[in-house]
Each structure stands twice: as C-alpha cells, then as structure tokens.
UniProtKB/Swiss-Prot annotation:
Functions as a zinc transporter transporting Zn(2+) from the Golgi apparatus to the cytosol and thus influences the zinc level at least in areas of the cytosol. May regulate beige adipocyte differentiation. It comes from the Eukaryota. Residues 1-7, 90-108, 171-199, 264-273, 328 are lumenal. This is Zinc transporter ZIP13. The chain crosses the membrane at residues 8-28, 69-89, 109-129, 150-170, 200-220, 243-263, 274-294, 307-327. One of its GO terms (cellular component) is endoplasmic reticulum membrane. Keywords: Cytoplasmic vesicle, Endoplasmic reticulum, Golgi apparatus, Ion transport, Membrane, Transmembrane, Transmembrane helix, Transport, Zinc, Zinc transport. GO terms for molecular function: zinc ion transmembrane transporter activity. Its main location: Golgi. It is found in: Golgi apparatus membrane; Cytoplasmic vesicle membrane; Endoplasmic reticulum membrane. GO terms for biological process: brown fat cell differentiation; intracellular zinc ion homeostasis; zinc ion transport. InterPro entries: ZIP (IPR003689).
Length: 328
C-alpha cells in the first residue's frame, strides 16, 4: 500500500487472493459432496420404508390373517358371554328389586357374586400371574422374593386405583354411589377381558387347536363370573337390558388384548404384560368384592338368611373351583 510504513503490507494483496481461492475450493468440494449425502440419506430412508413395509406385510400375511380372524372371533365370543345372565335372571327382576322379596333375591345373587369374585381372584387371576412370572424367570427357576413382592405391589396398586376412582367420582347421593360401584366393576371387567384377549391370541399364535381349547376354557370360566357381575350391575341401579349392554361393551377390552398380542408376535411380550395386568385386576376385583358387595351382606340381621348368604358365597367359590379343575 503506498505510503504505508509497514514492511508486510506489500504482501497483503497476494495473501488475500490465496485465501479467497482456498475458500472457494473448499466450498466447491463441500457442494460436490452434498448430492452424495443426499443420496445416502435417501437410500437409508428407503431401507427403513422397506423394512416397515415388510413387517406390515408379515403381520397381514395369509397365515397371520387367519390368526387375526380366529383371535378376534375368540375374544368376541368371550365378550358375548355377558349376555348369558339374561337367560338366567328372570325378566321381572328389574321391577321386583323395589319390593322386599326382590331385594332379598338380589342379595342372594350378590352372595353368589361375592364367592365368584373371590374365587376368580385367588383361583384364577393370581395363579395365572404367578405362572407368568415363573415362566419369565431366567431358566424357569421359579419366583424370586422380589418378583413375589412386585405381584403384591400390583395388587395393592389395583386396590388403591379403584379407591381413588371411587373417591373422584363419588356422588353425595346414595344412588350415585351405587352407580359408581357398577362402573368400577365394568372397568375391572374390561381389564380382565384384555387379559383374556391376550391369552386367546397367544394360543392361536401357537396353533388353532390350542387357541380353540383356550377359548372354550375361558368361556366356561366366565359364565358364572358374568352372572355375578350382572348382579352387581343390578344392585347399582341398572335395568336388565342396560346391564347387558354395558356387559357387552367390556368385550372391547378382549379385542384390544388380542390385537396387542398379535402385534407383539412374541410370547415374552404377552407374558410380561400379563404379569402385571393380572395382579392389578385382582386388586380391582378385591376392592369391589370387599368394599361394594360385602357391606350389603353384612346388613342382614336374620340368622337364617345370613346362613343362606354364607352358603351361596361358598357355592360361588365351589363353582369357580370346579371350573378351575376342569380347565386345568
């Protein structure tokens, strides 16, 4: 630069030209590599899309489609067992409940329902949960103390969840309180049907024969249980047809369970899910049996009627024992 006293200023122009040329060359290389990066990204995305389409294709293949149809039909049959009480409970039961004789007949049904609920929890749900945790143990060595404690915690979680729900939706009126107990029973039934859907679909994934046997076994087990649930809904203030429709709505849980089991396509995934769903459902049924049903039976002061209630409670347990023996 003219007039500048610095000795290095004369070299500033060539240095600036050199740095500019170097920057342009680097930008050119980077620009040339962008199509390659874009092509690599496109190829990766294509591979992911192909894998996803292959997984969906395997899920909806001919063999899987048969499993889908059989599992959904089996779960739907289990859900439709909620209509069975309409064939057992008299048509005039809804109007009879307002009379003293009708109230006594309802308490008889509730006694049987209480036995069925207790039998379902201690003879079916909890043993199934123990079996699932044993099969999930490494080497099939049985349950550890930690696994047993986890089962107990899930039972407590079910009880506390249903307690919280009843506290949230509890009405100050007695009628509202009864209806809340009915809806809680429907929630427990929906979760229970979810586990049935898991079992049905997992069995059909093995073979059609095992799937059919499992479906029939669950149907036989559910029939006395549905009668008890129907009695609980009648106690909650629903008429026969409303109770039947609400019972049928719980079949959605079975369809969801079947769909979940088929989508996972893994017996391990089904076992891990059932290992906590079953004890959680047990806690819900225990809450309904001991908090909503048992207090009604404790109000009875007549010794002869109290004895009849106790015998019907035992009959409900015996029926669940017999069905458990036949199923096993």
């Amino acid at each position: 630069m003219p007039g500048c006293p610095c000795p290095g200023c004369g070299m500033a122009g060539p240095r600036l030209l050199f740095l500019t040329a170097l920057a342009l060359e680097l930008l050119g290389r980077a620009g040339g590599s962008q199509p390659a990066l874009r092509s690599r990204g496109t190829a990766t995305a294509c591979r992911l899309d192909n894998k996803e389409s292959e997984s969906w294709g395997a899920l909806l293949s001919g063999e899987r489609l048969d499993t889908w149809i059989c599992s959904l039909l089996g779960s739907l049959m289990v859900g439709l067992s909620g209509v069975f009480p309409l064939l057992v409970i008299p048509l005039e039961m809804g109007t009879m409940l307002r009379s003293e004789a009708g109230a006594w007949h309802l308490k008889q049904l509730l006694s049987f329902a209480l036995g069925g609920l207790l039998g379902n929890v201690f003879l079916h749900l909890l043993p199934e949960a123990w079996a699932y945790t044993c099969s999930a143990s490494p080497g099939g060595e049985g349950q550890s103390l930690q696994q047993q404690q986890q089962l107990g915690l899930w039972v407590i979680a079910g009880i506390l969840t249903f307690l919280a729900l009843e506290k949230m939706f509890l009405d100050s009126k007695e009628e509202g309180t009864s209806q809340v107990s009915g809806y809680l029973n429907l929630l427990a039934n929906t979760i229970d049907n979810f586990t049935h859907g898991l079992a049905v679909a997992a069995s059909f994934l093995v073979s059609k024969k095992i799937g059919l046997l499992t479906t029939m076994a669950i149907l036989l087990h559910e029939i006395p249980h549905e009668v008890g649930d129907f009695a609980i809904l009648l106690r909650a203030g629903f008429d026969r047809w409303s109770a039947a429709k609400l019972q049928l709505s719980t079949a959605l849980g079975g369809l969801l369970g079947a769909g979940f089991a088929i989508c996972t396509q893994s017996p391990k995934g089904v076992e891990e899910t059932a290992a906590w769903v079953l004890p959680f459902t047990s806690g819900g049924f225990l809450y309904i049996a001991l908090v909503n049903v048992l207090p009604d039976l404790l109000e009875e002061e007549d010794p002869w009627r109290s004895l009849q209630q106790l015998l019907l409670l035992c009959a409900g347990i015996v029926v669940m024992v017999l069905f458990s023996l036949f199923v096993d």
